[in-house]
Regions:
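Catalytic-core regions of core metabolic enzymes
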Residues: 1-169
Length: 169
């Protein structure tokens, strides 16, 4: 256990961070992770203040780090890696990507896919808060660049403009 993200990166050569802190402190925790040039930050915390997330998104435009979340279950590539709270036992390696704003729908869809013998390359819960770091289009672009992903399942929420942008993409 380390006192700072920077110390963990220096000692363990970490390239990702998962944020599990109360909403009032989560913005600062994300900033701390962004300041260490990690490849990926996953913010599980729900309800990070909107002003904090607006500042985080401004900072994201200045760095090469991808933020998944907040208010998300995380990301998993079955059999390889998991960051977050996704129940790994329901996933099976395969060729279908999944991107969702809802953790519960993610679990249901993955369970249905796996039960039918359809495995997943990666599943990404992008988060349900008003301001998130990775959009549906960002996720679709990542899946498009992945030679192992042959199809993508997308689970949105009612009234979302991000879902409409993804449909146009």
């Amino acid at each position: 256990v380390y006192d700072t993200v920077e110390e963990a990166v220096d000692r363990e050569d970490a390239d990702a961070s998962v944020v599990f802190v109360p909403p009032a402190f989560a913005g600062d925790a994300v900033f701390e992770a962004l300041d260490t040039d990690l490849d990926l930050v996953v913010a599980i915390t729900e309800g990070i203040p909107t002003q904090d997330m607006a500042k985080v998104n401004k900072r994201l435009s200045e760095v090469d780090t991808r933020l998944i979340g907040p208010n998300c279950p995380g990301i998993i590539t079955p059999g390889e890696a998991k960051l977050g709270i996704l129940p790994g036992n329901i996933f099976e390696s395969g060729d279908v990507g999944l991107v969702s704003r809802s953790g519960t729908l993610t679990y249901q869809v993955v369970s249905n896919l796996t039960d039918r013998g359809i495995g997943q390359t990666t599943a990404i819960g992008i988060g349900g808060d008003p301001i998130i770091g990775t959009s549906f289009v960002d996720a679709l672009k990542a899946f498009e660049a992945d030679v192992d992903t042959h199809a993508v399942v997308m689970c949105g929420e009612i009234g979302g403009e991000d879902e409409e942008r993804a449909a146009r993409y």
